[in-house]
Regions:
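Conserved active-site and cofactor/substrate-binding residues in soluble primary-metabolism enzymes
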Residues: 17-21, 35, 39, 53, ...
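Conserved small/polar residues in nucleotide/adenosyl-binding loops
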Residues: 201-203
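Short, flexible loop segments at boundaries between secondary-structure elements
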Residues: 143-169
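Short, solvent-exposed amphipathic alpha-helical segments in soluble enzyme
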Residues: 85-89, 134-141, 166-170
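Active-site rim loops that border cofactor/substrate pockets in soluble metabolic enzymes
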Residues: 72-117, 126
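Ligand-binding beta-strand-loop-alpha-helix segment within the catalytic cores
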Residues: 2-79
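Hydrophobic alpha-helical bundle architecture
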Residues: 114, 128-143
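Hydrophobic/aromatic beta-strand patches that form the interior of the parallel beta-sheet core
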Residues: 68-70, 119-121, 149-154
């Protein structure tokens, strides 16, 4: 058996390959067109609702409650392997993931919202995507407010290019986040997030 490591998490390679093949199977049955990651994750939710052995996963729970999940770097994951397998099997007619349409959809959500805030665990592509909706809206000629608040829980340090090379204070200089209501929390998320959630439950 092979073991894969993702940061501090160990995964059975055989189980991971089952996931890849399942993604391929889901894609094979879909209408041939472009999908945003949100649309494709809805299809994963539908599949899990019928076929999952273990209930209560994040994706299935989001599907049950009509909560959208966006994954801007969807292809930069094991699930991306499943889509490559799908395209290899169907070279002429296959689905694609449209990250540009997805960014446009996220921007439209920002444009339509009365106010917005960010709660980020980690960083990377999702952090940049959601912050940049403010700038994208302005480039489209829409007058939008900055995100009113932002909290980021991370162990990354911006000095060496990690943390997406910037703290939330720097994000405020781009007009993305209100600088008076931002907080960097330098901590391991699994030790901090449960405390935050518990506090919210008891408010």
């Amino acid at each position: 058996n092979y073991i894969d490591r993702i940061y501090d998490t160990y995964i059975d390679e055989n189980e991971l390959q089952i996931c890849d093949k399942t993604i391929c199977e889901i894609a094979d049955k879909l209408e041939v067109r472009s999908y945003t990651s949100r649309e494709f994750i809805v299809e994963i939710g539908k599949y899990l609702k019928i076929n999952s052995k273990k209930k209560g996963s994040l994706i299935e729970t989001a599907y049950d409650n009509n909560v959208p999940i966006f994954c801007p770097a969807f292809t930069d994951s094991s699930a991306g392997f499943g889509l490559v397998m799908h395209q290899e099997k169907n070279p002429e007619k296959h689905i694609t993931i449209d990250s540009i349409r997805e960014f446009r959809e996220l921007t439209e959500i920002k444009i339509q919202s009365k106010g917005s805030g960010l709660f980020m665990i980690g960083g990377g592509v999702p952090k940049n995507f959601i912050q940049d909706t403010v700038i994208c809206a302005e480039l489209l000629g829409k007058d939008v407010d900055m995100h009113k608040y932002a909290i980021q829980i991370t162990v990354a340090d911006s000095r060496d290019g990690a943390c997406s090379s910037s703290t939330l204070k720097e994000a405020s200089s781009w007009g993305k986040v209100n600088t008076t209501k931002e907080q960097m929390v330098f901590a391991e998320a699994t030790s901090v997030l449960p405390l935050v959630i518990l506090s919210l439950i008891h408010i």
